[in-house]
Amino acid sequence: MSVLRIDRRIVHILLVVCVFIAAWVADACVAMHTEHKVAQAVKANSRLENTPDVFIGGTPYVWAAASKEIPYLEVKALDVEVPKLGMVNASTVLRDITVTPEQVMNGDIEGAPVSTYSRGISLDGVALGRLLGITDLSISNPDDISPSGGTSAEAELTGTLPGDTHKSTAKVTLRLVGPEFRMQVYDTDDERLQKAFSLNFDTRQLPLPAQATAVKMQGGTISFEIQRRNIKVQLAQLSPLEIEGSEQKAVE
């Protein structure tokens, strides 16, 4: 009898585990379906050659049907060719999306209210080096300075200047002054380094829907971001890169 009771307990535990796994798999399938649908819709309405990666946060996903809110959605495109910049990484992030149960299940979030909308573009050493004319440029954090963001940040640049046979290093400030991005050397009086590692440009030339509102240095890249609050999602806004006909032109 004791053996039978133990067997029944094991059966009950296995049943609970099976139900849990089945529910988890079903929830994952619904989430993957929504991510796939959003990705395909973004690709169809943008100039992206490849399907972007889409991630929807919140577990379990179907709980959004009851809470009527998707807490996080990210659309990311990696290694996208952009005129003047070369390959860049770009992303669009939506936070606190108010949805109906139907939108949760079918993945169509067009017109859904969003608490925070942000879009960012990241330039790695290759892309920034292309603007500076330095083919082997690398970007890192200055010593004893943690990654930062906002309207100002700092970075350390290393690369071989044209005509040189050895690499040079300089620390730079990253500033947003109105629509303009200003990168200036601050740790040396060497005029050649100051000229080589300095850069100014209008952030409205970036493939963003408006001038950048934040700049940060993180993970070997310099990122520019715009952020808006309390908007209603339009399909064109989900593209990680600004496209013709949405809000402003991409890089000219």
Model-derived regions, located:
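General beta-strand recognition
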Residues: 74, 182, 223-225
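Short, cysteine-centered beta-strand-loop-beta hairpins and adjacent loop/turn segments enriched
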Residues: 80-86, 162-168, 231-236
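Extracytoplasmic/luminal low-complexity segments enriched in Pro/Gly and acidic/polar residues
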Residues: 191-252
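A mature extracytoplasmic/lumenal domain signature
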Residues: 58-60, 79-81, 96-98, 161, ...
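N-terminal beta-strand/beta-hairpin edge segment
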Residues: 49-128, 133-139, 154-157
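Folded interaction domains in cell-surface recognition and envelope-stress signaling
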Residues: 134-217
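A short, surface-exposed beta-strand/turn
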Residues: 90-100, 170-179, 239-252
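Hydrophobic membrane-targeting and insertion signals
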Residues: 1-61, 66, 82, 236-237, ...
